[in-house]
Each structure stands twice: as C-alpha cells, then as structure tokens.
Amino acid sequence: MYKRQEKDWGKDDFTKIPNGCAGIENMYPYMLSAANEGKITFNKAVELCSYNPAKIFGCDAKGAIEVGKDADIVIYDPTKDFTITNDKMHSDCDHTIWEGIKVKGYPEATYSRGKLVFKDGEFLGERGWGKFIKRSSSGNL
C-alpha cells in the first residue's frame, strides 16, 4: 500500500513509481458483494480469497476450515450496506481508489487462530499476535 506522496516519487522517472494500489482491505467486501449480486457463488468467493491464496503461497494451515488448520474465519453479514471511504480503512494508506463505492454485505467479525481480532469495524488484534508462517514447498493449486 502506498501514500499519495510515494506515488509522486516517479513523476520524473516512471521506474521509481511503486507498483499497485491500496485495496486488499476491500477484497472481501467486493467479492462478497459480487456473490450477493449473483455474479459469483459464495463458495467461489471463499475459494478466490482464502483457499487459493493459501495453496499458492504454500500456507498449509490456512485457507479452509478443517481439523488441524488454524481457526481463521470471517463472520459476514450479507444484508449490511457499506460505503467504502478512506476514513473507514484500517491501513496506513491515505486514500482508497474505491472511495464512495457501495457494497452489499460486510464482515462483522474476524477470528485469527480462534481469537477475535476484528469486530464491528474495529481492529482488536494485539501487537505481536501475528506469527511467521513457514511455507511448504508445494505452492500449487
């Protein structure tokens, strides 16, 4: 993720422009909104946002609710209307390219390894809660 001033680094030399844009925080709301609209299935949204990334990056304890895997889960309200605005973002980025976009459905709570870390728009995680995840060698879908 980048702040606007960091994008200015490349104004005289495009090779200095940081790649990408901020937005990972909005991935689930967008995908779940698409599922609400019937554009994709809810199972496909989970596959694209959880299962496939875990497989691609070799994170064997992630991506599915199964015995022996980390207890990571998002509780989702499919009826909640939400407008994406920068002031509702939790990252250090100073803008969102999706400012003002309305989505149907929004995460209500998130559990990481069985511990509540997000509820009703508020991040509750503690510093140091994250842990290094050693990748497996597979990384295949």
Predicted regions and their residues:
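Short, positively charged
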Residues: T41-K44, T85-S91, G139-N140
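Generic detector of leucine side chains in alpha-helical contexts
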Residues: L32, L48, R113-L116, L124, ...
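Hydrophobic aliphatic residue packing
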Residues: M1-Y2, V117
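C-terminal cap of metal-dependent C-N hydrolases
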Residues: D8-N19, D70-K131
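His/Asp/Glu-enriched, well-ordered alpha-helical/loop segment
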Residues: K3-T79
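Short, solvent-exposed cationic patches
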Residues: F132-L141
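Generic alpha-helical secondary structure signal
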Residues: L32-A34, V46, K102, K115, ...
